[in-house]
Swiss-Prot record:
It comes from Burkholderia pseudomallei (strain 668). GO terms for biological process: lipoprotein biosynthetic process. It is found in: Cell inner membrane. GO terms for cellular component: plasma membrane. Pathway: Protein modification; lipoprotein biosynthesis (diacylglyceryl transfer). This is Phosphatidylglycerol--prolipoprotein diacylglyceryl transferase. The chain crosses the membrane at residues 17-37, 59-79, 97-117, 230-250, 265-285. It is an enzyme of class 2 (transferase). One of its GO terms (molecular function) is phosphatidylglycerol-prolipoprotein diacylglyceryl transferase activity. HAMAP family: Lgt (MF_01147). It is a multi-pass membrane protein. Its EC number is 2.5.1.145. The lineage of its organism: Bacteria, Pseudomonadati, Pseudomonadota, Betaproteobacteria, Burkholderiales. A 1,2-diacyl-sn-glycero-3-phospho-(1'-sn-glycerol) binds at R142.
Length: 296
């Protein structure tokens, strides 16, 4: 078993100002997105559409607003609506954590629609350009989760080579042990807990980095290197992210204030299913429609 390094959540101290790893990873994610966007400008069919470095900079401005506002509001509405309706001022305490990818996705979608309207471009032209830029940012965000030792995975066998002990999960581990003595006996977890005061869990943040970040990036990057029907790249992102998130959720610990919902699925899985369905329908529509994005 591997013990989580238990990093200091503060990366840099600047006098009274503390720069946290999670916020730093958001910055890294946006930088990666800009780099990927500029690399895409070198593709002939992308350059022919009239995209420029200034467009990328403007997109990132809209994207930051969409991620922060949408991610926070999504977390408030999808995960802890009851709490925040009772404590509305806590909605603004973003530094304490609490962001939702699906909310951020909706926020960015609306932000890109506004960008497209201002630039007189079709909305799907914009999302097709942006889609391959997103996974590297997702990977950076999940790395921030791992550094913080949060959003850990479900309990697993101590014999699994990837099993990890998360100090922050010790209280949850004790509650899990009391409720699952049948599995604990099968995996000798009582002995593990007596020795470490923790239980082995899946490092699900790393799974998400691998699937939602690295794998999805390469799939989108190679798919988008050739001209595709308008909407196809966006559709592949919806399918790829939705499928990756749905899969990883089987190893990720459900939110304690929600648990598992209908059919034993988590909130993340229920929010991912519409993405997959929408992506499949959009892909069919894109190829039936035919053609590629217009040139400038």
């Amino acid at each position: 078993m591997i013990i989580h390094p238990n990093f200091d959540p503060v990366a840099i101290h600047l006098g009274p100002l503390a720069v946290r790893w999670y916020g730093l990873m958001y910055l890294v994610g946006f930088i990666f997105a800009i780099v990927v966007g500029r690399l895409r400008l070198k593709l002939p069919h992308v350059a022919a559409q009239g995209w420029s470095a200034k467009d990328i900079d403007d997109m990132m401005f809209y994207g930051v607003l969409g991620v922060v506002l949408g991610g926070r509001l999504g977390y408030v509405l999808f995960y802890k609506a009851g709490y925040y309706f009772s404590h509305p001022l806590d909605i603004f305490r973003v530094w304490e954590g609490g962001m939702s990818f699906h909310g951020g996705f909706l926020g960015v979608t609306l932000a890109m629609a506004l960008f497209a309207w201002q630039r007189k471009r079709h909305w799907l032209e914009v999302t097709d350009f942006v889609a391959p830029m997103v996974p590297t940012g997702l990977a950076a965000g999940r790395l921030g989760n791992f550094i913080n030792g949060e959003l850990w995975g479900r309990v697993t066998s101590p014999d699994a080579p990837w099993a990890m002990l998360f100090p922050g999960a010790s209280r949850d581990d004790a509650a899990w042990l009391a409720a699952h003595q049948d599995i604990a006996a099968k995996w000798n977890l009582n002995e593990v807990f007596l020795s470490h005061q923790m239980l082995p869990r899946h490092p699900s943040q790393l799974y998400e980095i691998a699937l939602e970040g690295i794998a999805l990036f390469f799939v989108l990057w190679f798919f988008s290197r050739k001209p595709r029907p308008m909407g196809a790249i966006s559709a592949l992102f919806l399918i790829g992210y939705g499928a990756a998130r749905f899969t990883v959720e089987f190893a990720r610990e459900p939110d304690d204030f929600l648990g598992l919902l209908t059919f034993g699925l988590s909130m993340g899985q229920w929010l991912s299913l519409p993405m997959i369905v929408a992506g499949v329908l959009m892909m069919i529509w894109a190829y039936r429609r035919g053609g590629v994005a217009k040139q400038a």
